[in-house]
Design a protein with these regions (language model features):
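Short C-terminal tail/terminal secondary-structure segment
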Residues: 188, 199-215
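Short, flexible catalytic-loop segment of classical short-chain dehydrogenase/reductase
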Residues: 146-157
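Residue(s) in the substrate-gating loop at a strand-loop-helix junction
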Residues: 105
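Alpha-helical segment proximal to the catalytic Tyr-Lys
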Residues: 90, 133-138, 196
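Active-site helix of classical SDR
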Residues: 85, 121, 129
Length: 215
């Protein structure tokens, strides 16, 4: 959000809980995508960008996953995106050039153990990205960001010791873990007019792990 605010934009954020801190350019709406309906009257008539970034990591062996886990990930990662986008699409269409950004995972392209639930739902989201990019062109751009592991509170249990951080970094050709700022900068670029010739892309930001092998 701070990257977007640095460009003097007004940001409308939604989450199940409140937003930490205050800023006159942020309008927060309490919204649980799984149970609530987003009231379009709370939104501006024109929206220039939509970023859908739910937070969840269900990494477990396939044999221990219940069917409900797959349904839950699909509801949050795919159906929630569709539901929200259907509500705000008329406002995105009012913009002369708007941008939609979804978030996937490097595990869709690479294939990683214990990622079967999240990868299933995120791969569907990547398909949605390409389909909507074709349908909404040329007025609305649609792209998807697919990161590897990023040092955020959501990933804390995987990166809560120096040994875990070093081992995770070593799996990446660039020998480092991604940061929230790096993901935010790519997001800001895809929202900006500077990326107006980019649509229908799944962009890996993953330290090279999805395409390069150095060992």
């Amino acid at each position: 959000i701070s990257e977007i605010l640095s460009k003097e934009n007004i940001v409308f954020s939604t989450s199940r809980n409140g937003l930490n801190g205050t800023n006159e350019n942020i309008r927060h709406i309490k919204y649980d995508v799984l149970v609530d309906e987003l009231d379009p009257e709370l939104l501006p008539d024109q929206i220039d960008g939509f970023v859908y970034c739910p937070g969840t990591i269900n990494l477990r062996p396939f044999r221990s996953l219940k069917l409900e886990t797959f349904r839950s990930d699909l509801e949050l990662n795919l159906i929630g995106a569709i539901k929200t986008l259907q509500t705000i699409l008329p406002r995105l269409q009012q913009s002369p050039s708007s941008s939609i950004i979804f978030y996937s995972t490097v595990a869709v392209k690479t294939g990683m153990p214990f990622h079967s639930s999240v990868s299933s739902s995120k791969s569907a989201l990547e398909g949605l990205t390409k389909s909507l990019a074709a349908e909404f062109a040329p007025k609305i751009r649609v792209n998807c960001i697919a990161p590897s592991i990023v040092n955020t509170p959501l990933a804390n249990k995987f990166l809560n010791t120096e040994d875990k951080i070093e081992k995770a970094a070593a799996r990446h050709p660039l020998n480092k873990i991604g940061t929230a700022k790096e993901i935010a900068q790519l997001t800001q670029y895809l929202l900006d007019e500077k990326s107006k010739w980019i649509t229908g892309q799944v962009i890996n930001i993953d330290g090279g792990i999805s395409s390069v092998k150095v060992n």
